[in-house]
Amino acid sequence: MHSQFTLLDSFLTQTQPFWRYEAFHAYRSEALPWGVQHPGLTQWLNSLSLQEIEEYKADPERLTQILTQFFPSLAEIKRTMTVAKPPCIPSLPLPKHFDKGIPGRKWQQIEAMGKVLIAHNQGKQWLEWCSGKGYLGRILASVSQQPVVSFEYQAELCHSGQQEADALKLPMHFVQGDAFANDSFNLFEPVTHAVALHACGDLHVRMLQYATSAGVEAISFSPCCYHLTHDEHYQAMSSVAQNSALKLTRQELRLPLQETVTGGERVKRHRQQEMIYRLGFDALLSQQLGFSSYVSVPSIQKSQLSLGFAAFCAWASKEKGISLDLECADFAYFEHIGFQRFWQMERVSLVQEGFRRLLEIWLVLDKALYLQEKGYHVSVSEFCERQVTPRNLVVNAHRTKD
């Protein structure tokens, strides 16, 4: 695992110009982020039709095959960094209607994670970190019949989760608390198997720190939202990552999260329309008022998009308190600029996509190596298929026996 990380770290360091940029802001520069370093890559990007851009975005494997023509070592790195696929585990013996009230894809994630955790169970009790209503904990309690402590910040979720667990007669106890408060450390005991599904940023980091300090029997977690941290730059956990030349910004930590599989064609079109409107509004501000930097606009209800670009500009200028002469604005012109900028953003982001998973593996390996350094036997694998969620990596660790 150490040699894997070192190899990956070297590759990402050498290829920084091709992934360390914000595609959203790339349209503001006439030059591509990598300048004149790779004219063949630039020529290929500029030759793509809009349909081809969409097709490559929907098919990461096909995109990787193309990108390896420009980065010959990319294919070998991806092969070396391949993690174990989801294991073939029989269905769990769960009662009927156990998934009541849980959206289908979310339930698939929870059930898949539950299977992996049961297969790797090492402790005598579970600690479900950042539990929400305890959906994952219900599976663990039902199948293992071991007690589950579900730790959650939001009191209403604790109350609802406890009621449902009691109705199912499950050995679950909800604890409301702040993960960053010192007393939350007391939840970790040597016989505990600490688990977290998609715990965000600093939350999964805090769990690992507490769990290793307490010397818990086992730790299993699937990280998410790496950018949700108090620090401006990524704080590496393992000694090898701390020595890396890569000092990732909070914004760069968003990159692995930009691949999504949720939503259908309607959701995709809504996203495109909203981005075109935002970029068109930005162009209007730039040309009419001389704004030199992008103005962030609040989220908008998707139903409002159907009112058209002019209505969006009126709404956005009101939200931001900006005085605009909308009567004289050529909305068709600025909407077209937004359209062009959106597809330039999508075009440039294709190159980043070839590195996105590798950056996520870099982040996950840092945590895995940290656990190794703390005396745990560690494995990294996928707990479900990408189509269920791209955030499908799980780290399983158990204390090394003396």
Feature locations, PLM:
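Conserved SAM-binding loop of SAM-dependent methyltransferases across substrates and taxa
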Residues: K133-Q145
